[in-house]
UniProtKB/Swiss-Prot annotation:
Gene Ontology MF annotations: rRNA binding; structural constituent of ribosome
Family: Belongs to the universal ribosomal protein uL22 family.
Gene Ontology process terms (BP): translation
Self-association state and partner proteins as the record states: Part of the 50S ribosomal subunit.
NCBIfam families, sorted: rplV_bact
Entry keyword annotation includes rRNA-binding: yes
Role this protein plays: This protein binds specifically to 23S rRNA; its binding is stimulated by other ribosomal proteins, e.g. L4, L17, and L20. It is important during the early stages of 50S assembly. It makes multiple contacts with different domains of the 23S rRNA in the assembled 50S subunit and ribosome. The globular domain of the protein is located near the polypeptide exit tunnel on the outside of the subunit, while an extended beta-hairpin is found that lines the wall of the exit tunnel in the center of the 70S ribosome.
Species for this entry: Mesoplasma florum (strain ATCC 33453 / NBRC 100688 / NCTC 11704 / L1) (Acholeplasma florum)
This protein's name: Large ribosomal subunit protein uL22
Lipid metabolism in keyword set: no
Pfam family, one: Ribosomal_L22
HAMAP family for the chain: Ribosomal_uL22_B
Stored InterPro entries: Ribosomal_uL22 (IPR001063), Ribosomal_uL22_bac/chlpt-type (IPR005727), Ribosomal_uL22_bac/org-type (IPR047867), Ribosomal_uL22_CS (IPR018260), Ribosomal_uL22_sf (IPR036394)
Assigned keywords, A-Z: Ribonucleoprotein, Ribosomal protein, RNA-binding, rRNA-binding
């Protein structure tokens, strides 16, 4: 059985969030929590909260055992990009792209 959790519009670049997502993919949730807790990345905290939400969904909604769960799937998609302009010399302006991410995590109690 599976449980899902979503995190939308996180204001961190998808490329940076994917670094964290790759470290916890296919791990047991206890090992994934320990990894995220000790990881020195800005995106580790939101992904840790998302993982805890997925675990809570599995336990409360589906009645699964939290000790048997593992991270089956985690993927990061690109969200909408906020466009800002920075003034530059001689009346020019450069476009600054503020990228956002959508993160989806699926935990399961069935090993493949």
């Amino acid at each position: 059985m599976e449980a899902k959790a979503y995190l939308n519009m996180i204001r961190i670049s998808p490329r940076k969030v994917r670094l964290v997502a790759d470290t916890i993919r296919n791990k047991p949730v206890a090992a994934a929590i320990a990894t995220l807790y000790n990881l020195d990345k800005r995106s580790a905290e939101p992904v840790l909260k998302l993982l805890n939400s997925a675990i809570a969904n599995a336990v409360n909604n589906n009645g699964m055992d939290a000790d048997k769960l593992f991270v089956k799937t985690i993927f990061v998609n690109e969200g909408p990009t906020l466009k800002r302009f920075r003034p530059r010399a001689h009346g020019r302006a450069y476009e600054i792209l503020k990228r956002t991410s959508h993160v989806t995590i699926i935990v399961s109690d069935e090993r493949i």
